[in-house]
């Protein structure tokens, strides 16, 4: 019925891109609004969205979001939306130009991390300026996570004694 989770501040997370943190080094995060149709908002309220292959790009001075899959609204009829259409992100012009310069210069990517409702009920996208990880970076992160897990487990066992 509603979105997945509600925090104490009133933010309701619709969908997370957990794979993005595994595939990319997140450098900075930004918040952007998103231009949606009525059936898209209703479908998002039901939690029917997927960020798996989504990315953002600056095109003709506007920030666009590609491959965000929002399932068609079940009660919608002939006015229903296309699931993977390109959607416009709402950001200040200066912010868009700054991001465009960073993406062009350094070979960075704009990846959506999550889609959520803010306390006022508006749909927002958290974008990350990110750089792709190499396979050895991924292995290093996995090894560090395993070592931390083992250390925590040992500390818990020691406290039980």
Curated annotation (Swiss-Prot):
Keywords from the UniProt entry: Cytoplasm, RNA-binding
Disulphide bridges: none
PROSITE patterns in the cross-refs: SSRP
Domain of life: Bacteria
Family matches, as Pfam families: SmpB
Record SUPFAM superfamilies: Small protein B (SmpB)
Compartmental location: Cytoplasm
GO CC annotation, single: cytosol
A Gene Ontology BP annotation from the UniProt entry: trans-translation
Keyword Transmembrane: no
Gene Ontology MF annotations: RNA binding
Gene3D superfamilies assigned: 2.40.280.10
Main localisation: cytoplasm
Stated role: Required for rescue of stalled ribosomes mediated by trans-translation. Binds to transfer-messenger RNA (tmRNA), required for stable association of tmRNA with ribosomes. tmRNA and SmpB together mimic tRNA shape, replacing the anticodon stem-loop with SmpB. tmRNA is encoded by the ssrA gene; the 2 termini fold to resemble tRNA(Ala) and it encodes a 'tag peptide', a short internal open reading frame. During trans-translation Ala-aminoacylated tmRNA acts like a tRNA, entering the A-site of stalled ribosomes, displacing the stalled mRNA.
Family: Belongs to the SmpB family.
Designated name of the protein: SsrA-binding protein
Gene: smpB
